[in-house]
């Protein structure tokens, strides 16, 4: 079609099709009923078909109008989505970050509002994982993991260490005078087998069997400890809120260092210039984590 179709004519048709009334369409578009009618007639003339039947009590879409309407709606939706990507002259950017669940709830999410305030044109899509993630296969821009930084396919940036200590609800803590008193309680654990043995050694205790359930997340494990009156060994920096409000207690000052939290980015991406949003997030995260 050689003739350019005026955008106002398409807007007038779409609004009129929703209301089946030129007057109501005009109120939405802030133009007169006559202007809407003229825009629709212009579109009909360009297309060479009638889009409405003009009836005494309103409008009715013709077969051609019914066929055209969903295509117009889709076109407006595409334009709207494209325009939403801009914020105050900047194109919106989206990055996907896979975050180990304990870190997401205990540290990252409470601070993301500050990032969004500073960089409102960047959307962070957070997905959680249990420390097993394939960045390339899952289309992830970056991941935050727990460990020692020995991942081969990624560039690894340490955020901070995550010392583990005993956490339990206050009613249990009251009954723990010495570490040996924990023998009377169920000890919860994650999939890392060395956790409790390392803590027993740090506490100068002869190990005893740990038979509590195994969790894939320290967050879930500590929730279970609060509900069931059990004892957990967890990265206490991720539970500062619970410690401050008294729902969890550190009965002993004995800590073990089992690893830390790391930002990881595929080497294949690090070898080329990172996109602007990912580079901004990386810089913000490193600065924020190193300040604690």
Curated annotation (Swiss-Prot):
What function is annotated for this protein?
This protein is a positive regulator of gene expression of carbapenem-hydrolyzing beta-lactamase (smeA). Seems to also be a repressor of its own transcription.
| UniProt KW DNA-binding keyword | yes
What protein name does the entry list?
Carbapenem-hydrolyzing beta-lactamase transcriptional activator
One Pfam entry name:
HTH_1
| Residue spans binding DNA | 22-41
Span of domain HTH lysR-type: 5-62
Q: Which GO terms describe its biological process?
A: DNA-templated transcription
Q: Which GO terms describe its molecular function?
A: DNA-binding transcription factor activity; sequence-specific DNA binding
> InterPro entries from the entry?
LysR_subst-bd, Tscrpt_reg_HTH_LysR, WH-like_DNA-bd_sf, WH_DNA-bd_sf
Q: What keywords were assigned to this record?
A: Activator, DNA-binding, Transcription, Transcription regulation
What the record says about family reads: Belongs to the LysR transcriptional regulatory family.
Record's Gene3D superfamilies? Periplasmic binding protein-like II, Winged helix-like DNA-binding domain superfamily/Winged helix DNA-binding domain
Does the keyword field hold Transmembrane?
no
């Amino acid at each position: 079609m050689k003739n350019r179709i005026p955008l106002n004519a398409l807007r007038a048709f779409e609004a009129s099709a929703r209301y089946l009334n030129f007057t109501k369409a005009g109120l939405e578009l802030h133009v007169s009923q006559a202007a809407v009618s003229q825009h629709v007639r212009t579109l009909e003339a360009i297309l060479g078909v009638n889009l409405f039947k003009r009836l005494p009590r309103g409008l009715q879409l013709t077969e051609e109008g019914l066929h055209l309407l969903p295509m117009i709606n889709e076109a407006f939706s595409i334009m709207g989505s494209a325009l939403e990507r801009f914020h105050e002259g900047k194109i919106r950017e989206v990055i996907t970050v896979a975050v180990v669940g304990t870190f997401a709830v205990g540290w990252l999410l409470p601070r993301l509002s500050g990032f969004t305030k500073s960089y409102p044109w960047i959307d962070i899509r957070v997905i959680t994982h249990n420390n097993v993630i394939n960045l390339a296969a899952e289309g992830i821009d970056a991941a935050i993991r727990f460990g020692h930084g020995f991942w081969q396919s990624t560039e690894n940036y340490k955020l901070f260490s995550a010392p583990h200590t005993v956490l339990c609800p206050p009613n249990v803590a009251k009954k723990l005078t010495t570490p040996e008193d924990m023998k009377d309680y169920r000890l919860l654990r994650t999939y890392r087998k060395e956790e409790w043995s390392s803590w027993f050694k740090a506490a100068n205790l002869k190990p005893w069997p740990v038979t509590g359930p195994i969790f894939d997340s320290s967050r879930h494990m500590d929730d279970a400890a609060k509900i069931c009156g059990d004892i957990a060994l967890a990265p206490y920096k991720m539970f500062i809120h619970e410690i401050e409000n008294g729902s969890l207690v550190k009965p002993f000052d004995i800590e073990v260092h089992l690893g830390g939290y790391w930002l990881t980015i595929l080497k294949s991406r690090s070898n080329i210039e990172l996109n602007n949003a990912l580079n901004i997030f990386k810089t913000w995260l490193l600065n924020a984590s190193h300040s604690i």
